[in-house]
Amino acid sequence: LIGCHNLIEPDTDRVLVIDIGGGSTELSYVDARPAHEGGLKGLLRKPPILAWRSLPVGVVTLTEAFAHLPEEEAYPQMLAHVMGQIDKWKRAPEIREAFASGRAHVIGTSGTVTCLTGVTLGLTKYRRDKVDGAWMTREAMMGTVEKLRAAGMAKMHTFPTIGTDRAGLMLAGCAIVEGMWSLAPRGDMRIADRGLREGLLLSMM
């Protein structure tokens, strides 16, 4: 979280950090206010975690769970599975109110969200300087999800920022992103192509 410190907007009270992995997805709902203090001291202050959960849905596990279904059937079932995992969080009034009032935003960090961002930006090759720190609206990202679903698994690898290695996992990744964003339908997502290494370096200063 420290590595994503400067991605927190100054007027933000709360941040929902979504980290999509292969076997799980980590959700951290944090108090962003301590991060607003200036200088190195503020940079090293870890925002207090108000709520945290590790969900047993990742791009690999979700892909494997629905591999027996055709794509057009698999996606809605993947999405329904993800939505079932976050039902309790969706009903949390504090989270709903923070995003409804504009006091919160999402930070997304994972290969899935960075690949989706690259496609959304129309990059002909992956560029970290364009992706890291970029803002994505829900409308723009969901438009990319629909584009990838229409292309299908057979053509997923043709998108430059996806390629062959990640193509087989993107359908599940799209379902997770769509499901997670339902927690903050009015919130934009700040994209982070960073994480543990940057946080460790800052902690050593």
Question: How does the language model describe each region?
Answer:
Residues 1-14, 29, 37-39, 46-205:
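Helical "lid/coupling" subdomains associated with nucleotide-phosphate turnover
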Residues 32:
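Internal, well-ordered alpha/beta segment that forms a basic, Gly-enriched binding/recognition surface
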